[in-house]
Each structure stands twice: as C-alpha cells, then as structure tokens.
Curated annotation (Swiss-Prot):
GO terms of molecular function: rRNA binding; structural constituent of ribosome; tRNA binding
Family note: Belongs to the universal ribosomal protein uL16 family.
PANTHER family: 50S/60S RIBOSOMAL PROTEIN L16, LARGE RIBOSOMAL SUBUNIT PROTEIN UL16M
Encoding gene per record: rplP
One GO term of the biological process aspect: translation
One cellular component (GO) term of this entry: cytosolic large ribosomal subunit
Stored NCBIfam families: rplP_bact
Top-rank taxon, per record: Bacteria
Name this polypeptide is given: Large ribosomal subunit protein uL16
Length: 155
C-alpha cells in the first residue's frame, strides 16, 4: 500500500476540503481518466483496491497511472481509552481529494476496455466519479470567418 517514506511531523490536523481542485485536474499521461465529482478522504487501501481491480481487468494490455498519493496521517485512539491524554497514534494514510481531481489515468487500451476497468475501480471508491478522455480537455478552436461571411456581415 502507498504511504510516505518519512514525514516532517507524525500527526496532522484534519483540515477542510473547500472548493474545486486547481492542481491535478487535467489528463497528463494517458488517454483516459477517472475524475472525482465530490470531496473526500480516499484511503491507501481504497487506492490499492481500485488499482488491483483495473490491473486485473486490463491484464498486460495498457498502462495505469495513479495520480493521487495518501500523504495525510489519520490517528485513532486505542479502544476503551479514557478522554484526554493526547492525540492517538497514526493508524492509516489518506489522500485529500477535491472535485475535479484526476484519480487514475490509463493508456494503451481501447476505450470500451478502459471504461469498464475504470467502472470496476469506481466501485471501490467512496465518492462519485466520472470517466473522461483526453479529448474532453482540449479547447475547441475558434471558428475562422470566411471571406464570404465577412463580406455579408459588412452590408
């Protein structure tokens, strides 16, 4: 499972998930992607389960990129512990995901195969997601006016 090799501090505060993702919201490596539609903490176990589901379906065919990394420790108190006596110990790692963030990318396979693999991965995640292609992110070219259109518009 994914986790940082070392961190500056063992424990972090919970924080807030406001707004949309401003980074990691475009497809950079593959042809297809899975984009988050709502904010959530995604655990290292959920990322690993999604990766296994995609890899098992695609087999040797394509390549998969995991675009998120669990770098936030979540602490838990021991069972039947009285109140007070400080914060609990880190138990697992999560990735803070905002809407619009690309979670996984895939390339080297046909779109129906990628779509089904991403659907299987989406079932392992606690949020709503959407399948996107690289073409969805390309800006449409502004239409160039032809000479006949320019002549008629000046009349």
């Amino acid at each position: 499972m994914l986790s940082p090799k070392r961190t500056k501090y063992r424990k972090q505060q919970r924080g807030r998930m406001k707004g949309k993702a401003t980074r990691g919201n475009r497809i950079n490596f593959g042809e297809y992607g899975l984009v988050a539609l709502e904010p959530a903490w995604i655990t290292a176990r959920q990322i690993e389960a999604s990766r296994r589901a995609m890899t098992r379906y695609v087999r040797r065919g394509g390549q998969i990129w995991i675009r998120i990394f669990p770098d936030k420790p979540v602490t838990q108190r021991a069972a039947e512990t009285r109140m007070g006596s400080g914060k609990g110990n880190p138990e697992y790692w999560v990735c803070v995901v905002k809407p619009g963030r690309i979670l996984f990318e895939m390339g080297g396979v046909a779109e129906p195969i990628a779509r089904e693999a991403m659907r299987l991965a989406a079932q392992k995640l606690p949020i709503k997601v959407k399948f996107v292609t690289k073409a969805d992110f390309e800006k449409p070219e502004p239409a160039q006016a032809t000479a006949s259109e320019v002549a008629t518009s000046s009349v």
